[in-house]
Regions:
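Sec-dependent N-terminal signal peptides
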Residues: 4-13
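Hydrophobic alpha-helical membrane context
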Residues: 14-15, 94
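Sec/Tat signal peptide C-region and signal peptidase I cleavage site
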Residues: 16-20
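OB-fold and OB-like single-stranded nucleic-acid-recognition modules
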Residues: 21-177
Length: 177
């Protein structure tokens, strides 16, 4: 009887460990094809879930009243002014290349955009949030990715409006347009 109980606990432990390993795999890794995909000028390069029927809101409205849009699924459009150079897991999106931007992260790190996405037009659907980034994270983002933050708090943290995209579409801007 003792052996059966010990064996049962052993199997239970193995199954728990196996399930924990599966949970760790939820974050995908960017492939070379993800990183180097060409962004078309006559159609959209689509990543993540298809764009749905979320309310379209201008980035200027989101940035002016972030609390109004926090937690809501919306569609935003703009130009990518900067993006992750390691995997393509985030981008900064602005209405124009010289306007204030919002950081767009790809939901659950499950899809990626090309590393050379800066300058492309983008449509992204997802959820707006207001977050405080820790000093270590801010320092890392500045050092590794050249991120820019307008208002850094005295303790080195940053409060920022961010956007978690469930889907994103990219289109190259034709020269002269």
């Amino acid at each position: 009887m003792k052996k059966i109980i010990v064996f049962t606990f052993f199997l239970l432990g193995l199954s728990t460990a196996a399930l924990a390993q599966e949970g760790m795999k939820s974050m995908a890794e960017a492939t070379e094809a993800d990183k180097t995909a060409a962004i078309p000028s006559d159609s959209y390069l689509k990543r993540g879930a298809p764009i749905g029927k979320a309310e379209k809101v201008s980035l200027s409205k989101v940035l002016a009243e972030p609390a109004k849009y926090a937690g809501r699924t919306v569609l935003v459009e703009g130009v990518i002014v900067r993006s992750c150079k390691m995997e393509g897991c985030w981008a900064e999106l602005a209405e124009t290349k010289d306007s204030k931007s919002v950081r767009v992260k790809m939901k659950d790190h499950a899809f990626f955009i090309p590393l050379q996405s800066a300058g492309a037009m983008a449509r992204a659907e997802g959820v707006v949030s207001v977050k405080t980034l820790g000093k270590a994270q801010v320092d890392h983002m500045i050092a590794e990715d050249g991120a820019k933050f307008e208002n850094r708090n005295a303790d080195g943290t940053v409060s920022e409006v961010s956007f978690e995209a469930t889907g994103i579409e990219l289109k190259s801007i034709k020269p002269g347009s």
